[in-house]
Amino acid sequence: MKKFLAMLLALAMVFALAACGQSAAPAATEAPATEAPAEEPEEIIVFAAASMTETLNQIKEIYEKDHNVTITYNFDSSGTLKTQIQEGADCDLFISAGQKQMNQLDITADKEINTDGLDFVADGTRINFLENKVVLVVPEGNPAGLEGFDDLAAKLADGNVFMAMGNSDVPVGQYTQKILAYYDLDEEALANAGTITYGTNVKEVTTQVSEGSVDCGVIYCTDAFSAGLTIIDSATKDMCGQVIYPAAVLKTAQHAEAAQAFLDYLTGDEAMAIFESVGFSPVA
């Protein structure tokens, strides 16, 4: 009986010690949750006509705040951009200041224009994006006293004015060539006579006028607005046609979906308000 009581006492002590040990053990703590690393933003590479520099840079700031992307722009003449794309430059989205340069990259375009059979434009992405106006601008004070395109044509014929225009592979230069042809003026003869000078893109022409190194220049309405230049006349459709800016995602795009999403945004109300504030308009 004594042995039995001793065994019970021993067991009771074992259970008591076990309970004490259990209560003394520190409470388990959960490991702090770690946040998943943020995804790297996608880079969208946009090749755009130089005349869109100010508006697209403004839109970039807005768009990047609300989307996990970084936008890298390459602004230049549409002809230069087309050549860079053709030579293999990385580009997701192309916005041209003229149909010709886009057509030269579009396999569905007239073969007389796309003479190399280039196939860069992604199916179903090409749109007529914006419309601009071709205008005649003068430096401060209008030193040549120009009154409009009719007056310009007469003074060019007489050699009494010095005009800046885009060269032949720049859309604004091609529009100017149409204006000269409208007035039956010989561009080559004018160049040889020293009455016209050239810029490699519309920004160069704008700068020549702003600095007063020429009597006038033919540029886009939007560039005149951005540079604060005086517009004395606007070209009609009969003079140079409609000035349409096409845009398209490219087949070689590394971030095609992000580029398409950005193009969709550019056609929306928020972005269009910025374009319209400087003289662009939706295509009618």
Predicted regions, residues:
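Short, P/G- and charge-enriched loop/turn segments at secondary-structure junctions
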Residues: 120-125
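Bacterial signal peptide processing site
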Residues: 21-23
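Pocket-flanking alpha-helical
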Residues: 78-119, 225-228
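Exported/periplasmic ABC-transporter solute-binding proteins
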Residues: 27, 31-64, 79, 98-99, ...
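C-terminal motif of bacterial Sec signal peptides marking the signal peptidase cleavage site
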Residues: 15-19
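Positively charged n-region of N-terminal signal peptides that target proteins for export
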Residues: 1-11
